Amino acid sequence: MNFILLSASDAHKIVIQKLMQYYIYDFSEYIKYDVGDNGLFEPYPNLMDYWERDNNQFPYVIKMNDKYIGFVLVKLINSIERNYFSIAEFFILKKYRREGIGKAIAVKVFNLHKGHWEVYQINSNIPAQIFWNKVISEYTKGQFEERLEDGKKIQNFEN
């Protein structure tokens, strides 16, 4: 696996915008999105906010052999109970899945952001639930909690 996880610069905005169309297409299986009259899905809300300074949002692009293969959007959520990191979106093009890249990227992202984490998946996205449960279980050596809340499965842990 010869992949690179890069902090997404301004130059990567358009790359993530375009990859987001594939992500939304994949996700439309679980939440019924439709394309507009222009043949595209609606733009991801507030995507450009990830490049605002000091906003606790961290966009990443994933490259393999000099080709873009995905992205990760991480947020630091400031909560009354505690601050925590969350993976807002995680996407790898289908042809690169099931090769261990997703797990390796997730581990790299977790290691970049130390603290409390909450990773959630919608109830209907069973493949994502299986993926995240396995990755987080291995990463934490089983030291994580899982709960159902507001139609989502949530894993939380400290690293």
Where are these regions (language model features)?
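Conserved N-terminal entry element of GNAT/NAT acetyltransferase domains
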Residues: M1-I31
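Conserved GNAT-fold acetyl-CoA-binding loop/helix
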Residues: I24-M48
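A short helix-loop-beta-strand connector motif used in the catalytic cores of GNAT acetyltransferases and
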Residues: P45-V61
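Conserved beta-strand in the GNAT
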Residues: P59-V61, K67-L76, S86
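Conserved acetyl-CoA binding element of GNAT-fold acetyltransferases
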Residues: R82-K94, Y120
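Conserved acetyl-CoA-binding loop-helix of GNAT-fold acetyltransferases
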Residues: I92, R98-N111
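Conserved beta-strand-loop-alpha-helix junction that forms the acyl-donor binding cleft
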Residues: E118-N133, S137, R147-D150, E158
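Glycine-rich ATP-binding loops of the HATPase_c
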Residues: G142-F144
